[in-house]
């Protein structure tokens, strides 16, 4: 590993060069005339042709080779599988192909005892993270080891994939992992500082996007590491003022995604996107308030105090709670409708405990029936009986989770959505660190450096 290979070198070197550059004609010829060459490995790191094909994203050659090799989990010098290298380099087609033929997603390397999921999260390949997690749900791992256990699998320093993603400033991976059941408040043994949570590591790296996402999933700002430090102290120690401002225990609590609610986990993609965008907007408002007048003010999506489309809709389409936003969410089976912002206020009036698996679902503010399902509202101007309008304006009592009559008619932000941080979808991601290429060690040279990738 770490040495470029020329087609003019020895035959076993030439086969690796052919794989690397995608010369499928040569590979077919070798398979027909000199198949023993396919059993060769590179001189130092002992990469097989499967490793080289996977790392270089040569999906056609990889597929061809997998027809010959009965074992897709060949090991190199560091006990890394082809699937690990595909995940490391973000070769999504190779990741999917290897998973399809039964590559073991539960193999551990000998460098840091990491799996392919650790590699994908560490290097920021969210699509590979998702593909591996999808494979885990349908593989024997889910049956014999447990899907939740796999998502939160630890390396030899006690780091889960979520810890690595947060430390390496990978907000998209953080989002996928949290959405798949990663424990937001899990502590490391020795990775980073002993006892670090993902929030400690995001604070240390200064990734405000990761901080936002973790807070939105209920990360505890007051949880301490083994040295007694809360994430705020870690952020300020490393001079990440914007992160520190959001993590300051004296600042307003963020609005938290109500993941413990069963109907939230069952949302279809369209309804989930609407609610996530509402959460993003609410927490952006909270950020603007916290950072106002500081040197850390951040750009936020621009929007006016009144919706541009207000003049184009009839009163019957407006949310009967805030009278400001168009109804976009419908409660099944009663059919009552609300805007996404008021729906979140109803579901999130209490911050969920990340360790709680079940909570009492909220009730519809109009008919008091228990909410079991939320879908995107299908507004129809000609069907006024579905509007479920009220004679009085109703407001959500966030403390009691109740609804009462009132003359309240404020902007949606007055429903205290802005009290509480985290954009969810559509946020710009922090640029990844430059990759350090080495001569094949595959190790982490220091705590604050990227793991060396092999040059293949």
From Swiss-Prot:
Entries under InterPro entries matching the protein: Ankyrin_rpt (IPR002110), Ankyrin_rpt-contain_sf (IPR036770), RING_XB3-like (IPR056760), Znf_RING (IPR001841)
SMART domains membership: ANK
GO MF entry, a single one: zinc ion binding
CDD domains: RING-HC_XBAT31-like
One GO term (biological process): response to heat
ANK repeat ranges per the UniProt record: 45-74, 78-107, 112-141, 157-186, 194-224
E.C. code: 2.3.2.27
Keywords assigned: ANK repeat, Metal-binding, Repeat, Transferase, Ubl conjugation pathway, Zinc, Zinc-finger
Catalytic activity of the protein: S-ubiquitinyl-[E2 ubiquitin-conjugating enzyme]-L-cysteine + [acceptor protein]-L-lysine = [E2 ubiquitin-conjugating enzyme]-L-cysteine + N(6)-ubiquitinyl-[acceptor protein]-L-lysine
Alphabetical list of PROSITE patterns matching this protein: ANK_REP_REGION, ANK_REPEAT, ZF_RING_2
ZnF RING-type: positions: 319-368
Pathway per the UniProt entry: Protein modification; protein ubiquitination
Keyword Repeat: yes
Cited function: No E3 ubiquitin-protein ligase activity observed when associated with the E2 enzyme UBC8 in vitro.
UniProt-recorded name of the protein: Putative E3 ubiquitin-protein ligase XBAT31
Organism (species): Arabidopsis thaliana
Lineage of origin: Eukaryota, Viridiplantae, Streptophyta, Embryophyta, Tracheophyta
């Amino acid at each position: 590993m770490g040495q470029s290979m020329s087609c003019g070198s020895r035959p076993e070197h030439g086969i690796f060069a052919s794989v690397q550059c995608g010369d499928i004609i040569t590979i077919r010829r070798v398979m027909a005339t000199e198949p023993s060459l396919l059993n060769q490995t590179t001189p130092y790191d002992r990469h097989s042709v499967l490793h080289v094909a996977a790392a270089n994203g040569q999906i056609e050659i990889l597929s061809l080779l997998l027809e010959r090799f009965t074992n897709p989990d060949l090991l190199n010098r560091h006990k890394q599988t082809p699937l690990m290298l595909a995940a490391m380099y973000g070769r999504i087609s190779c990741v999917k192909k290897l998973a399809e033929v039964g590559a073991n997603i539960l193999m551990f390397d000998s460098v840091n005892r990491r799996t392919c999921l650790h590699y994908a999260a560490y290097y920021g390949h969210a699509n590979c993270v998702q593909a591996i997690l999808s494979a885990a749900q349908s593989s024997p791992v889910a049956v014999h080891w447990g899907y939740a256990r796999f998502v939160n699998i630890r390396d030899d320093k006690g780091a889960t994939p979520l810890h690595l993603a947060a430390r390496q400033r990978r907000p998209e991976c953080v989002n996928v992992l949290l959405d798949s059941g990663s424990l937001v408040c899990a502590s490391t043994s020795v990775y980073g500082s002993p006892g670090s949570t993902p929030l400690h590591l995001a604070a240390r790296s200064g990734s405000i996007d990761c901080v936002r996402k973790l807070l939105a999933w209920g990360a505890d700002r007051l949880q301490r590491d083994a040295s007694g430090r809360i994430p705020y102290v870690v952020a300020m120690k490393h001079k990440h003022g914007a992160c520190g401002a959001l993590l300051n225990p004296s600042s307003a609590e963020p609005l938290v995604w109500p993941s413990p609610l069963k109907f939230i986990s069952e949302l279809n993609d369209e309804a989930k996107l609407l609610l996530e965008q509402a959460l993003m907007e609410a927490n952006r408002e909270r950020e603007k308030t916290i950072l106002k007048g500081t040197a850390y003010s951040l750009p936020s999506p621009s929007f006016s105090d009144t919706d541009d489309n207000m003049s184009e809709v009839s009163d019957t389409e407006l949310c009967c709670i805030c009278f400001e936003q168009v109804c976009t969410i419908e409660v099944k089976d009663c059919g009552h409708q609300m805007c996404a912002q008021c729906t979140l206020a109803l579901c999130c009036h209490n911050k969920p405990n990340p360790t709680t698996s079940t909570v009492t679902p909220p009730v519809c503010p109009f008919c008091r029936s228990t909410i079991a399902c939320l879908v995107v509202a299908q507004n129809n101007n000609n069907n006024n009986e579905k509007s479920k309008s009220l004679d009085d304006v109703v407001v959500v009592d966030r403390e009691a989770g109740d609804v009462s009559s009132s003359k309240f008619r404020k902007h949606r932000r007055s429903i205290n959505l802005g009290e509480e941080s985290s954009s969810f979808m559509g946020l710009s991601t922090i640029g990844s660190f430059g990759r350090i290429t080495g001569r094949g060690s595959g190790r982490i040279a220091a705590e604050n450096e990227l793991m060396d990738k092999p040059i293949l």
